[in-house]
């Protein structure tokens, strides 16, 4: 088991069982997010870069971070705007960050801001930085819709046309294809299947009923509503919208507590007519951004910061995107805990990304299945079941929302805050992503 000496705020403390030998402790100093809102609503007139700017700016103000202490900025995003292809850099400049501080953008579907965080962790661990802002953003109110390929080829060919007949011919091809635009892909490139279809098949494979999915969705919205009312979402920062009717957006707007009767009346959204995934038990299109300040513990303490949590370890996994697209949590949680020398019982807080209610419940069933764990994970037996009284107690992506590039930081922040409130020691984050990818992160309470 790896051990290293850790310190609490200004004072030495006992060694942590999961700290890595001969490597600096990495800490989450603080994090923020804009309100997560339903796409097409209050943020519909903004660009993604505007939201990421707001998150970075708010984080700097909240932490009182002097720019001379900041080494690098990393942001994740999925559906990119061509004008801001390196959105991290553009957002940083708009936020007033000095142009001498580098910034780059990463992407890995729904775990893009996890990649931003772990990339930063690597830079900190190797001594290439002391302080990094890691975040992410998605704005699905406005996505790049382009002309189809035939129209694009014709447009590019127009420059080579040398006479009027040739130009008229190419012009006809352009006009012919104008009414067939290409929307951003919603299906897996390798399989042609949408995530919703995959979620439906996964729920069926692991015997998750429609009722169980609807009940889990109601649970998510109910817990998120209670958390919001009780002031738990201290990571949310307001966004001021200028215009003819200026207003300030202060809270998430997709949390809606409903009843089982209402949810059961909805028709399947993907596999018709007998599917079980509906608009209510799936996460919705969301606009939002997040940003986290991470440092080495030594640097944080030397400069007067009080960290919220240790970022102890992480692990990425990948599997068959056809049959196991959304099963990453079931693979990564056992592997991550094995790597850390911990057991299921050692974990006090779980934050699992809720792409679909059925996806979360299927992963819980998979980890509690002798057959799955023996056949697919080559374990001696089932790993065990994640207790519901430790899982997503402030709601999750089903209720709070899921801006693809921003969710990872939200998961880390809620884990850190829950550890403090619940007086726990270890938290585990797990999330699936397109391509059959997944991530797990191990977080330890600071000063525990």
UniProtKB/Swiss-Prot annotation:
It catalyses: an acyl-CoA + acetyl-CoA = a 3-oxoacyl-CoA + CoA. Signal peptide: none annotated. GO terms for biological process: fatty acid beta-oxidation. It comes from the Eukaryota. Its EC number is 2.3.1.16. One of its GO terms (molecular function) is acetyl-CoA C-acetyltransferase activity. It is an enzyme of class 2 (transferase). Keywords: Acyltransferase, Fatty acid metabolism, Lipid metabolism, Mitochondrion, Transferase. Pathway: Lipid metabolism; fatty acid beta-oxidation. CDD domains: thiolase (cd00751). The active site is at 110 (acyl-thioester intermediate), 402 (proton acceptor), 432 (proton acceptor). SUPFAM superfamilies: Thiolase-like. InterPro entries: Thiolase (IPR002155), Thiolase-like (IPR016039), Thiolase_acyl_enz_int_AS (IPR020615), Thiolase_AS (IPR020610), Thiolase_C (IPR020617), Thiolase_CS (IPR020613), Thiolase_N (IPR020616). GO terms for cellular component: mitochondrial fatty acid beta-oxidation multienzyme complex; mitochondrion. It is found in: Mitochondrion. Mitochondrial enzyme that catalyzes reactions of the mitochondrial beta-oxidation pathway. Belongs to the thiolase-like superfamily. Thiolase family. This is Probable 3-ketoacyl-CoA thiolase. It comes from Caenorhabditis elegans.
